Curated annotation (Swiss-Prot):
UniProt signal peptide: none
Gene name of the encoded protein: rpoB
A GO MF label: DNA binding
Matching PROSITE patterns: RNA_POL_BETA (PS01166)
Pfam families: RNA_pol_Rpb2_1, RNA_pol_Rpb2_2, RNA_pol_Rpb2_3, RNA_pol_Rpb2_45, RNA_pol_Rpb2_6, RNA_pol_Rpb2_7
Quaternary context: The RNAP catalytic core consists of 2 alpha, 1 beta, 1 beta' and 1 omega subunit. When a sigma factor is associated with the core the holoenzyme is formed, which can initiate transcription.
Entries under PANTHER family matching the protein: DNA-DIRECTED RNA POLYMERASE I SUBUNIT 2
Function statement: DNA-dependent RNA polymerase catalyzes the transcription of DNA into RNA using the four ribonucleoside triphosphates as substrates.
GO CC terms, sorted: DNA-directed RNA polymerase complex
Enzyme Commission number(s) of this protein: 2.7.7.6
Family recorded in the similarity comment: Belongs to the RNA polymerase beta chain family.
Domain of life: Bacteria
Name the UniProt record assigns to this protein: DNA-directed RNA polymerase subunit beta
Single biological process term from Gene Ontology: DNA-templated transcription
């Protein structure tokens, strides 16, 4: 045993079953959010040298702003942020937004314009810092605090800018003909569509308006007919040769053609190929090699072809024929008459090259650029008369003006790639060449060359993260502001103003506020547990502004695409209308600078797999062959098999090993975080895995978290990256620990400018967004040595730094008296009594005292007509005590509101006269506990408006807070003193003194003992002869003084914030928040689930003695129905049960060996067993090098059950499970004989029994159960409201009415439709009747009938009720009978 490893017991040790080594580090799971927003704000960058992206780019794109006359200009210089006013916790408590003030330096330049020459000269330059509103900051965990609540900005998937080619799949035209179309999508600006119609004419549309012939667009670009044709077609020259014509021969043009008439050499007259034969490519090439230069053509060959250029009489300028005209006899005669000996025709054969553009030109009525521009102008702005200037300006602004049109760097890169162009990615507008290239490519597609694009390919979809969404929003705000600035610059005397006077930052600030407050992508963070937080931050939504809508999204967009592999999880997506539109990022994926999702791959060089990792987007990956991660490799990293399964361009195929150039990094890389937490995922059906990954996000944090026996190795990563467990920022020694904070004296990364002390505040019983409880517990003890990144405190749902969403429970798979029919769950009472599935929920109640028209509301204990009993929990200020147990209807905060004056009765006057004023002019509006909620008050916060006198309770809370701050300051000061004075002693111990405190002899050697005789404050008076050392001493002293000052200043600042009044909404004088904690034990009706999508509702809680038990008397905790497994195909739960059983068996064995050690002090058997469990490899803990103390600590940790990790797609196989069961001394069948707890008889068959990890989900029966007595009614229909929140009733719908009709239950039906619902008079009568003890009543007219009548009257149909009874109607005459 060469080197001993100490094991500190602060982390969970897992036995790893994975066989594939991890090559790449998994990126931080919330990097997506943090990197994006950092790139937008660029706080760290020096303000002078920021690159043009993010906020800098927005300012650069809007500024400089010139006024309308050009006499002045406002330029942007730089921006910077002041430190935020309040820190994250203060913002949470005070309902504020965590943000930093944005200061922008602007420069106003005023010009002198010479009236004669128009020359400009600078007259004046002014610079000024302008406050431009607050910019929200991101917390360390990738969230935003907006008005006191944590929000997440979800990343959006949208179609990447660029050009896309597609066809209608034959749906438009009845013949099923494919109509091709191209679309140029910019990042912002007008869309350009170019499409074929059923007659093969090419049309262009701008912004989905009316279509125009594509040639109109080309003419507007400055081309004429001849130029258009010469761009799209080659020409063939027919030369007059006696009576015949000759055309040049080219092998390219003639290959593959069937020869209709003999092919005759024009020079020799010999027939080189007879009619009816096919000219193969080889034969065509041979003819050229033999020297065939030209062939004969007849006039018939000319007919049907098109002229390539205009035929003009240059003397008169008369145009005889135009380019594109079809040649017929008449045209040919004209040509021969004009004496043409050469005719250039377009090379169109209607097979490989169609005449689409020529036909479009023929259809197009526009002849010139002006007509084309006018035509476009009319389409874009119907009803306005065009002029050349306005039409030209409008056309230019559509695609060629960088203010209005932006392809973005991504769009330009995509366009260059698709069209083989080479424009710089700074060219963000369209060019003439781009439009021509698009039309050319479209025509080629129609001719059968090339492929259309797949818009669901991840190469054509990109991610917009927080930074980019925010950038777009801020640009909108600045543009609104720009208009106002321009107007103000023109209307004001510009010489006398400063930049501050021109700027009104409200629109910019409003745009930011609007985005964070009400954008569809700014969501209330799902904070149920750490996993739900992380998943929310990694979510990708195709919905939102500029995205899809649920109704319009078809099946294709939602479906899994081959390019999702390693980028988007194919499993985790919601069930229901959003399926496939909301996705989750895969574990190893990251987003590149262009917004495309990249996945990591290992490079394969010369058939050997290297550890060199490259990240590739879907576009780049398409060119490679990628091998799976579980391919068999030899020692040198070469492929064992001749042929390897690999993916290439979306297809899975067998490829020779020489062709493989990449390999996956990890088997986890194709799934998301939540799916990677499911052990044996490979054995579950995908539908159930989807439910499993979604339900883990709904698991409620339990009072005692317990990590799963059977994990996947992802647990510590999630706990760390979510920020639930606290990791040490730098190494050091623990100095102090209590439940609320940990103080660590740093020993690594010591920086003179920073404090040498790290204080970690722990969150205690805080309420999360979902009312679950956030509570952190320290894991360290005083004196522990900590390394950077060690977990020092556990949070909600974490256990020793591992994610722990549920509990390990002993499960038996068997039916039990029908109590687990249809996925019901039978539980043991022991689970309730041991608080296994108990959770704490914290509800927040808020009450505000406002200033009303009749006078201010008052928070007080003095409430009219309330018994002393009801006030027993309130203090003298009328606010409930902390620790009070409250029940439904109890008063939490007493509040009275002034009542309107009403005329007094004589009795009231008398009472007033006797007892003084205050009798009845206030009413009780106290805050009471809602029905069905019980709990304990855990926290009270009181907020007062500036200048409002604070009550006793507010003062007490304030004093407590200041004491806590003072304690923090004193502790930090004490550690600082200890550090600094310790260093001082080390520096001067044994040195010769040059001076010292009073009474000290110069020249004496300083020793530690000597120094202790003087008080610490005098130690600074020692001076040494060594000048260099003396300089260091002085530096230490000044640093110490600075640190002290900083500490005091920080303390004073915080105290000032505590004492200052709070910002309140208008009209609110005082606000009280009461937090009530509720302990929820598990009960029938609660929903539970495993990790494999096996969910159910608790049906009964059985006494322990009735539960089935094993031979040794161990009772099952939970009984599940075995029929829930086969049809659902989530066999993973059975494998987990077996492996969990083996884990517990091994744990029991270790417990027994621990007892042996305690009796005999022989540790060897224990050591050998642990070394057998954790074999020596790079994935397992180095147990062989543990010392005895570490072995005992480990044994104590695993005696309840050995934790193991079985990573997805690389986990334990059947043989591993069997081996582990055998090691634990259990049957390899995984089944045991069970005995019936009620009779003690054994069951007939052996039963599968083992440990399974069960979660309690956030669907608690307490939150759902609800019964209405008399409650609120809807104003219009007078029917009871619906839903628990409104204390509503149960809807009696159309179908329920049919049921009563079918039974003939006429009276019940009448009651349902009248007195129990909306017959206003009737229901009061019923109440009165019941009170009298009389049970007769009459139904009247339902209010909804009156609503119907009113609606009909609004349509002009008068409906009146006829009140006459049938009895009064006259009898009909006999004839009518």
């Amino acid at each position: 045993m060469a080197q001993t490893h100490s094991f500190n017991g602060r982390k969970r040790v897992r036995k790893f079953f994975g066989k594939i080594p991890e090559v790449a580090e998994m990126p931080n799971l919330i990097e997506v959010q943090k990197a994006s927003y950092d790139q937008f704000l660029m706080v760290e960058e020096p303000s002078g040298g920021r690159p043009d992206e993010g906020l800098q780019a927005v300012f650069k794109s809007v500024f400089p702003i010139q006024d309308f006359s050009g006499a002045s200009m406002l330029e942007f210089v730089r921006y910077e942020f002041d430190p935020p006013k309040f820190d994250v916790d203060e913002c949470r408590q005070r309902d504020l937004t965590y943000s930093a003030p944005l200061k922008v330096t602007l420069r106003l330049i005023v010009f002198d314009i010479d009236e004669d020459t128009g020359a400009k000269s600078i007259k004046d330059i002014k610079e000024q810092d302008v406050y431009m509103g607050d910019m929200p900051l991101m917390t360390d965990n990738g969230t935003f605090i907006v008005n006191g609540t944590e929000r997440v900005i979800v990343s959006q998937m949208h179609r990447s800018p660029g050009v896309f080619f597609d066809h209608d799949k034959g749906k438009t035209h009845s013949s099923g003909k494919l109509l091709f179309a191209a679309r140029v999508i910019p990042y912002r600006g007008s869309w350009l569509d170019i499409e074929f119609d059923s007659k093969d004419i090419v049309y262009a549309r701008i912004d989905r308006r009316r279509k125009l012939p594509a040639t109109t667009l080309l003419m507007a670009l400055g081309m004429d007919g001849e130029e258009i044709l010469s761009t799209f077609y080659k020409t063939v020259t027919y030369t007059r040769d006696g009576d015949n014509w000759r055309i040049p021969y080219s092998a390219e043009r003639f290959k593959g053609m069937k020869i209709i008439s003999d092919l005759v050499d024009a020079d020799t007259g010999e027939v080189v190929l007879e009619a009816g034969k096919k000219l193969t490519a080889r034969a065509a090439k041979q003819l050229a090699e033999k020297g065939l230069k030209a062939i004969k053509a007849t006039e018939d060959d000319l007919f049907g072809s098109y002229l390539a250029e205009d035929v003009v009489n240059y003397a008169t300028g008369e145009i005889y024929l135009e380019a594109g005209d079809e040649i017929d006899e008449k045209v040919l005669k004209t040509l021969i008459d004009t004496g043409e000996t050469e005719i250039n025709v377009l090379d169109i054969d209607h097979v490989n090259i169609g005449a689409y553009i020529r036909n479009t030109l023929a259809v197009d009525k526009n002849e010139s650029r002006q007509e084309a521009l006018f035509d476009i102008y009319r389409v874009m702005r119907p009803g306005e008369p065009p002029t050349m200037d306005s039409a030209e300006a409008m056309f230019h602004s559509l695609f060629f003006d960088s203010e209005r049109y932006d392809l973005s760097a991504v769009g330009r890169v995509k366009m260059n790639m698709r069209l083989d162009l080479d424009a710089e990615d700074t060219v963000r507008v369209l060019r003439k060449e781009d439009i021509l290239a698009v039309v050319k490519m479209l025509v080629e597609l129609r001719d059968g060359r090339g492929e259309i694009d797949d818009i669901d390919n991840l190469g054509n979809r990109r991610v917009r993260s927080v930074g980019e969404l925010m950038e777009n929003q801020y640009r909108v705000g600045l543009l609104r502001m720009e208009r106002a600035i321009k107007e103000r610059m023109s209307s004001i005397e510009i010489d006398t103003v400063m930049p501050q006077d021109l700027i009104n930052a409200k629109p910019a600030a409003a745009a930011v506020r609007e985005f964070f407050g009400s954008s569809q992508l700014s969501q209330f963070m799902d904070q149920t547990n750490p996993l739900s937080e992380i998943t929310h931050k990694r979510r990708l939504s195709a919905l939102g502004p500029g995205g899809l809508t649920r109704e319009r999204a078809g099946f294709e967009v939602r479906d899994v695409h081959p390019t999702h592999y390693g980028r988007i999880c194919p499993i985790e997506t919601p069930e229901g209308p959003n399926i496939g539109l909301i996705n989750s990022l895969a574990t190893f994926a990251r987003v590149n600078k262009y917004g495309f999702i990249e996945s990591p791959y290992r490079k394969v060089v010369d058939g050997k797999v290297t550890n060199d990792v490259v990240y590739l987007s879907a576009m780049e990956e398409a060119k490679h062959s990628v091998a799976q991660v579980n391919v068999e490799l030899d020692e040198q990293g070469g492929f064992v098999d001749e042929f390897v399964i690999c993916r290439h361009a979306g297809e899975v195929m067998m490829a020779p090993r020489e062709n493989v150039d990449l390999m996956d990094v990890s088997p986890k890389q194709l799934v998301s975080v939540a799916a990677a937490l499911i052990p044996f995922l490979e054995n579950d059906d995908a539908n159930r895995a989807l439910m499993g990954s979604n339900m883990q996000r709904q698991a409620v944090p339990l009072v005692r978290a317990e990590a799963p026996f059977v994990g996947t190795g992802m647990e510590p990563i999630v706990a760390r990256d979510s920020g639930a467990a606290i990791a040490a920022r730098r190494g050091g020694i623990v100095d102090q620990v209590d439940a609320t904070r940990i103080v660590i004296r740093a020993t690594e990364e010591l920086d003179p400018s920073k404090s040498g002390v790290d204080i970690y505040r722990l969150q205690k019983f805080q309420r999360s967004n979902q009312s679950t409880c956030i509570n952190q517990r320290p894991l360290v003890r005083v004196g522990d040595r900590i390394h950077k990144g060690d977990i020092i405190a556990d949070g909600p749902s974490t256990d020793l730094g591992d994610l722990a969403l549920g509990r390990n429970v002993l499960v038996a798979f068997m039916p039990w008296n029908g109590y687990n029919y249809e996925d019901s769950i039978l539980l043991s009472e022991k689970i309730v009594s041991d608080d296994v599935f108990t959770s704490i929920h914290i509800e927040e109640f808020e009450v505000a005292a406002r200033d009303t028209k009749l006078g201010p509301e008052e928070i007080t204990r003095d409430i009219p007509n309330v018994s002393e009993e009801a006030l027993k929990n309130l203090d003298e200020a009328g606010i409930v005590y902390i620790g009070a147990e409250v029940h439904p209807g109890d008063i939490l905060v007493g509040k009275i509101t002034p009542k309107g004056e009403s005329p007094m009765t004589p009795e009231e006057k008398l009472l007033r006269a006797i007892f003084g004023e205050k009798a009845s002019d206030v009413r009780d509006t106290s805050m009471r506990m809602p029905p069905g909620t019980y709990g304990t008050v855990v926290e009270v916060r009181v907020f007062n408006r500036h200048g409002v006198e604070k009550d006793e309770r507010a003062m007490a809370i304030e004093r407590e807070e200041i004491e806590r701050l003072a304690k923090d300051r004193d502790d930090e000061q004490a550690i600082l003193d200890r550090n600094v004075y310790g260093r001082l002693v080390d520096m001067i111990d044994g040195k010769v003194a040059a001076a010292g405190p009073k009474g000290f002899k110069k020249g004496t050697t300083i020793t530690r003992e000597l120094m202790t005789e003087y008080p610490r404050s005098q130690w600074w008076q020692f001076a040494v002869e060594d000048e260099k050392l003396q300089g260091e001493l002085e530096a230490l002293r000044s640093q110490y003084d600075d640190s002290k000052k900083l500490l005091e200043a920080r303390f004073m600042d915080k105290v000032e914030k505590v004492q200052r009044g709070d910002e309140m909404p208008p009209g609110v004088m005082k606000m009280v928040k009461v937090f009530v904690a509720v302990k929820r034990k598990i009960q029938p009706g609660d929903k539970m689930a495993g990790r494999h999508g096996n969910k159910g509702v608790v049906s009964r809680i059985l006494p322990v003695e009735d539960m089935p038990f094993l031979e040794d008397g161990t009772h099952a905790d939970i009984v599940l129905n075995p029929l829930g497994v086969p049809s659902r195909m989530n066999v993973g739960q059975i494998l987990e049960t077996h492996l969990g059983w083996a884990c517990a068996g091994m744990g029991k064995k270790i417990g027994e060996l621990l007892d042996v050690y305690r009796k005999t002090a022989n540790i060897e058997p224990l050591r050998q067993t642990l070394e057998h469990i954790y074999p020596d490899n790079d994935r397992n803990e180095p147990v062989r090098s543990y010392d005895d103390d570490a072995i005992l600590m480990l044994a104590n940790q695993v005696k309840r059950g050995v934790s193991i990790a079985t990573p997805v797609f690389d986990g334990a196989v059947e043989a591993d499970i069997n081996a582990m069961l055998t090691d634990a001394g259990l049957a390899t069948s995984g089944q045991s004989t069970l005995y019936d707890g009620r009779t003690g008889e054994p069951f007939d068959r052996q039963v599968t029994m083992g440990y399974i990890y069960m979660l309690k989900l956030h669907h608690l029966v307490d939150d759902k159960i609800h019964a209405r007595s008399i409650g609120p009614y809807s104003l219009v229909t007078q029917q009871p409201l619906g839903g628990k929140a409104q204390f509503g009733g149960q809807r009696f719908g159309e179908m329920e009415v049919w049921a009563l009709e079918a039974y003939g239950a006429a009276y019940t039906l009448q009651e349902m439709l009248t007195v129990k619902s909306d017959d206003v008079a009737g229901r009061t009568k019923v109440y009165e009747a019941i009170v009298r003890g009389d049970d007769t009543f009459e139904a009247g007219i339902p209010e909804s009938f009156n609503v119907l009548v009113k609606e009909m009257r609004s349509l002009g149909l008068n409906v009146e009720l006829d009140d006459t009874r049938e009895a009064e109607q006259p009898a009909l005459p006999d004839a009518a009978e």
